[in-house]
UniProtKB/Swiss-Prot annotation:
Function: Catalyzes the oxidation of glucose 6-phosphate to 6-phosphogluconolactone.
Catalysis performed (reactions): D-glucose 6-phosphate + NADP(+) = 6-phospho-D-glucono-1,5-lactone + NADPH + H(+)
Protein name (record): Glucose-6-phosphate 1-dehydrogenase
GO terms assigned for molecular function: glucose-6-phosphate dehydrogenase activity; NADP binding
Residues binding substrate: H197, K201, E235, D254, K359, K364
Gene coding for it: zwf
Native source species: Nostoc punctiforme (strain ATCC 29133 / PCC 73102)
Binding site for NADP(+): R62, D104, I105, K167
Pathway(s) where this gene product acts: Carbohydrate degradation; pentose phosphate pathway; D-ribulose 5-phosphate from D-glucose 6-phosphate (oxidative stage): step 1/3
Residue numbers annotated as active site: H259
Signal peptide: none
Length: 509
């Protein structure tokens, strides 16, 4: 595997500078995200010499662990989640920068002990007062953690102290606004990094370059040439061990309002004045403010929810959502959501955007598909000569890349046409173009680059778009009225009707 420093796509490019040494404080450090994603991402950056060796990680959680036990747990987690990663001499050096501070989210004494430890580590590790506080805890704990950090004086330096907040940011518009008020009481906006790890993926970042750096595509990126857009994020897994969280969230809050909305924004936004954080985020806010559900008066024509029922995945029988451990047998929580957006602006007027996401679907895939209009000519009328619309697809996962489908004549004496794909894949370079995206996001946060993080008004604008659906779906409902789809299938029948009513159909992936 070729390392990032040997990535052929980066040949001839100036490397991003190295951030200053700093302490990264992870709240909720006993959770699996820490050993599955966060610590491995930071270790990857260290292996690639993208962060200084003085970089220090402090885990915070309720369990009474020692520094050494925390290091052992992180190593065990690395061995389990990333068995191919070398944990030799470099890991031993890296792990000496791992520390632990036990404490409760709502206990001021815990924060004072943490503050004392951070001061000691500044002297010992040479981190110069630079801090990143990463909230990897249940969303209900966000306000209290921020209040305790703020009142304890740990967010007071607007240039050295940064706050990273995992999604979801709120559970509706009102709670997002309330959380923003808490954040703004103790932080400047430039200190706050609302993380969405989808924005760390190569293909997502490549969207802006693909659109605005290539003259052959941007002129076609509008209502004159685009028939519709489909954005899909499909998962094969079920709720697994997240029933407690998922029952209160569902597919709309867990996936569509954040991950899919970010893909949507980058697809639909106007060109920013500059490739900097505020310019890009301002354009995302503008397109969100112009976005609406297609029909809020007849919600079924613009939004569909569903739940997976018992079925088969890869030859194995799997239970339905309501029979999963920890799930209410009468749950109305959606594991599938499909929505139709319209954009009231000059570029996209009349072009529908169809977004869908679900669990227990036939395959794990995330993509953006731009469906162009069919040619107006009737010259290809016979069945053998029938042409198909061009489709530009950006694959987010797996096999990240970009493909363009177009029609050609088949070789031979007969005049027959067929569709072919012109394809670019990051894998063709012999590199792993993406990891879990957290390494890029960590590095950007350490460098103070907010481009791939959401701004306060952007979060609120995204919640505003889906509020009409939430207001209906959050109301008590008869469980028998929730559409079902068998595990291992693509969607409930009602979701098919959502797009079929417009004379279109979902892509079969």
């Amino acid at each position: 595997m070729v390392s990032l420093l040997e990535n052929p796509l980066r040949v001839g490019l100036q490397q991003q500078g190295m951030p200053e040494p700093q302490i990264i404080v992870i709240f909720g450090a006993s959770g699996d995200l820490t050993w599955r994603k966060l610590v491995p991402a930071l270790y990857k950056l260290r292996r690639e010499r993208r962060i200084p060796p003085e970089t220090t990680i402090v885990g915070v959680a309720r369990r009474e662990w020692s520094h050494e036990y925390f290091r052992e747990q992180m190593q065990k987690g690395m061995e389990e989640a990333h068995p191919d990663v070398d944990l030799g001499e470099l890991w031993q050096d890296f792990s000496q920068g791992l520390f632990y501070s036990p404490g409760d989210i709502d206990n001021p004494e815990s924060y004072q002990k943490l503050k004392t430890l951070l001061s000691e580590l500044d002297e010992k590790r040479g981190t110069r007062g630079n801090r990143m506080f990463y909230l990897s805890v249940a969303p209900s704990f966000f306000p209290e953690a921020i209040k305790q950090l703020g009142s304890g004086g740990m967010l007071e330096d607007p240039y050295k102290h940064r706050l990273v907040i995992e999604k979801p940011f709120g559970r509706d518009l009102a709670s997002a606004q309330s959380l923003n008020q808490v954040v703004q009481k103790y932080c400047k906006e430039h200190q706050v990094y609302r993380i969405d790890h989808y924005l760390g993926k190569e293909t997502v970042q490549n969207l802006l370059v693909f659109r605005f750096a290539n003259a052959i595509f941007e002129p076609l990126w509008n209502r004159q040439f685009v028939d519709h857009v489909q954005i899909t994020v499909a998962e094969t897994v079920g709720v697994e061990d997240r029933a407690g969280y998922y029952e209160s969230a569902g597919a709309l809050r867990d996936m569509l309002q954040n991950h899919l909305m970010q893909l949507y924004c980058l697809t639909a936004m106007e060109a920013p004045n500059a490739m900097d954080a505020d310019s890009i985020r301002t354009e995302k806010v503008k397109v969100l403010q112009a976005t609406r559900l297609a029909d809020v008066h007849n919600l079924s024509r613009s939004a569909v929810r569903g739940q997976y029922s018992a079925g088969w995945m890869k030859g194995q029988a799997v239970p339905g959502y309501r029979t999963e451990p920890g799930v209410d047998p009468n749950s109305t929580t959606p594991t599938y959501v499909a929505m139709k957006f319209l954009v009231d602006n000059w570029r996209w007027k009349g072009v529908p955007f169809y977004l869908r996401t679900g669990k227990r679907m036939p395959k794990k895939v995330s993509e953006i598909a731009i469906h162009f209009r069919e040619v107006p000519s009737r010259m290809f009328q016979s069945a053998a000569q029938q042409t198909n619309a061009n489709i530009l697809t950006m694959r987010i996962q797996p096999n990240e890349g970009i493909s363009l489908r177009f029609d050609v004549k088949m070789p031979g004496a007969e005049f027959r046409t067929r569709s072919v794909d012109m394809d670019f894949s990051y894998g063709s370079f012999g590199i792993q173009a993406t990891s879990d995206a957290y390494d890029r996001l960590f590095l950007d946060c350490m460098m103070g680059d907010q481009t791939l993080f959401t701004r306060a008004d952007e979060v609120e604008a995204a919640w505003q778009v889906v509020t009409p659906a939430l207001s209906v779906w959050d109301a008590p409902a008869d469980p028998t009225t929730i559409p079902q789809y068998e595990a291992g299938t693509w969607e409930p029948e009602q979701a098919e009707l959502l797009i079929n009513q417009d004379g279109r159909r979902w892509r079969r992936l």
